[in-house]
Amino acid sequence: MSVHIGAKQGEIADKILLPGDPLRAKYIAETFLEEPKLYNEVRGMYGYTGTYKGERVSVQGTGMGVPSISIYVNELIQSYDVKKLIRVGTCGAIQKDVNVRDVILAQGATTDSQMNRLIFNGIDYAPIADFELLKNAYDAGVDKGLHLRVGNVFTSDTFYRDNAQQVNELLAKYQVLAIEMESTALYTLAAKYGRQALSVLTVSDHIITGEETTAEERQTTFNDMMEIALDTIIK
């Protein structure tokens, strides 16, 4: 067991999907995994292990934001020796040609989070995805006939901000595709520990147009994203 995960050694696979919403973790396990077993419910953050196409895979909720995902990624790697980690989550689009329900592969993750500045003593480290996972995810999406978007996302520490329009316009000018709250931490920690990581994101709302999905959709749909992530992580 670790501080925030109640699993025993051997109960977590070395390949794991990381949704922020623990109810999405439950949905993924019950919908896509064979014989899923609950290994964690500490703080309501459900974690399951099962098999997908004959390969052992886990799924663990992480909560929202850099501090929360950092706790789970650190413990999954240090206490359970997880090798491959794929975040499956939602994001808000800031490019006009990115649509609600599009799937984005986050090649890099710009951020306003202080975490990396504290770690790197003011240096602006550029967290990026693992290339092998990125390529495999792109190929998996193409095989499904999907039009994937690949590029930079913005990991924000702030969901509500007074100068949001100004920040969004600046980020869009520099070709950032969407805004989310976790990928920078995932990529930085994966680099630190020599692990493979990727964020596969579904656009749940469009910050410019105002189009959005429902809370129920965000919990229990977006199956394209989940299948891409699962097919990628077992390669």
Curated annotation (Swiss-Prot):
Q: Coiled-coil segments, which residues?
A: none
Q: Does the keyword Glycosyltransferase apply?
A: yes
According to the record's subunit comment, the protein's assembly and interactions are: Homohexamer; trimer of homodimers.
Protein's UniProt name = Purine nucleoside phosphorylase DeoD-type
Q: Entry's PANTHER family?
A: FI09636P-RELATED, URIDINE PHOSPHORYLASE
GO cellular component terms listed in the entry, alphabetical order: cytosol
Matches recorded under Gene3D superfamilies: Nucleoside phosphorylase domain
Name the positions where a purine D-ribonucleoside binds. Answer: 4, 180-182, 204-205
The enzyme's E.C. designation: 2.4.2.1
Organism whose genome encodes this protein? Oceanobacillus iheyensis (strain DSM 14371 / CIP 107618 / JCM 11309 / KCTC 3954 / HTE831)
Entry keyword set: Glycosyltransferase, Transferase
Under InterPro entries, the record lists: DeoD-type (IPR004402), Nucleoside_phosphorylase_CS (IPR018016), Nucleoside_phosphorylase_d (IPR000845), Nucleoside_phosphorylase_sf (IPR035994)
Q: Where is this site: Important for catalytic activity?
A: 218
Catalyzed reactions? a purine D-ribonucleoside + phosphate = a purine nucleobase + alpha-D-ribose 1-phosphate; a purine 2'-deoxy-D-ribonucleoside + phosphate = a purine nucleobase + 2-deoxy-alpha-D-ribose 1-phosphate
Q: What does this protein do?
A: Catalyzes the reversible phosphorolytic breakdown of the N-glycosidic bond in the beta-(deoxy)ribonucleoside molecules, with the formation of the corresponding free purine bases and pentose-1-phosphate.
> A single GO BP annotation from the record?
purine nucleoside catabolic process
Q: Which residues catalyse the reaction?
A: 205
* Molecular function, one GO term: purine-nucleoside phosphorylase activity
Where, in this chain's numbering, is phosphate bound? 20, 24, 43, 87-90
Q: Which family does it belong to?
A: Belongs to the PNP/UDP phosphorylase family.
